[in-house]
């Protein structure tokens, strides 16, 4: 029998949402449930019980200052329209904007239309009229990963990551605490991410694709056996 279930998911920050989701999980598992946010999962996975600045770069982006127990400061992410600097969705948004206006290199644009088998009108349709446009935009980041040797693409990535530092990381006491990253985009662009961090005088010692291994270590240190752990693979990490 499970003694405890820990569930981490996107948007699980309010008491109302935690209670609703927790009640559903209690009915399913018949055991005590603790529901927390994906951001706390990132912080615990990256830092265990140490203090530091945890950052997520995936489809979306987020960050927080974690004191080793709880999140004490969080710069609001804002979503891919008003924020999410450094994320795959925002990188894709800027690239597609340049593509639609003919500002991206012709060779890169031609390869994009060939590989995605999509027209400019279909791009507009995917962004404005279909579900989950942020996920569509984020898929562009995987395409761009093959073109980092192109000056235009490289600068696009650099600018996106630099905006994450200036608008998010720099709002924390980043000179006095370690900074670590998790998420598919952070992991895919790790060398460039380290380069941008270096411009801010930051040395990154940890960049993970997911927080799961660190979370397992965290809970093995803080809970008894027979605990079930689930970190929902949200847009933040993917």
Regions found by a protein language model. Name each.
Residues 1-13:
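N-terminal short beta-loop-beta anion/metal-coordinating cradle
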Residues 12-107:
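Phosphate-binding/catalytic loop of phosphoryl-transfer enzymes
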């Amino acid at each position: 029998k499970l003694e405890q279930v820990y569930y981490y998911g996107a948007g699980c920050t309010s008491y109302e949402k935690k209670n609703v989701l927790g009640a559903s999980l209690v009915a399913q598992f018949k055991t005590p449930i603790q529901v927390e946010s994906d951001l706390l999962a990132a912080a615990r996975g990256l830092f265990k019980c140490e203090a530091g600045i945890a950052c997520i770069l995936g489809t979306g982006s987020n960050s927080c200052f974690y004191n080793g127990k709880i999140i004490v400061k969080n710069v609001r992410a804002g979503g891919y329209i008003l924020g999410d600097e450094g994320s795959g969705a925002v990188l894709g948004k800027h690239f597609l904007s340049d593509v639609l206006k003919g500002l991206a290199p012709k060779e890169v644009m031609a390869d994009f239309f060939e590989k995605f088998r999509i027209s400019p009108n279909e791009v507009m349709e995917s962004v404005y009229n279909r579900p989950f446009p942020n996920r569509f935009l984020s898929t562009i980041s995987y395409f761009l990963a093959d073109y980092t040797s192109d000056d235009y693409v490289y600068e696009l990535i650099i600018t996106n990551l630099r905006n994450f530092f200036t608008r998010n990381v720099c709002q924390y006491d980043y000179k006095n605490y370690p900074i670590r990253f998790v998420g598919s985009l952070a992991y895919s662009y790790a060398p460039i991410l380290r380069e941008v961090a270096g411009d801010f005088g930051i040395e990154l010692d940890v960049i993970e694709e997911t927080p799961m291994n660190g979370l397992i270590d965290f809970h093995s240190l803080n809970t008894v056996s027979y605990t079930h752990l689930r970190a929902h693979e949200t847009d933040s990490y993917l």
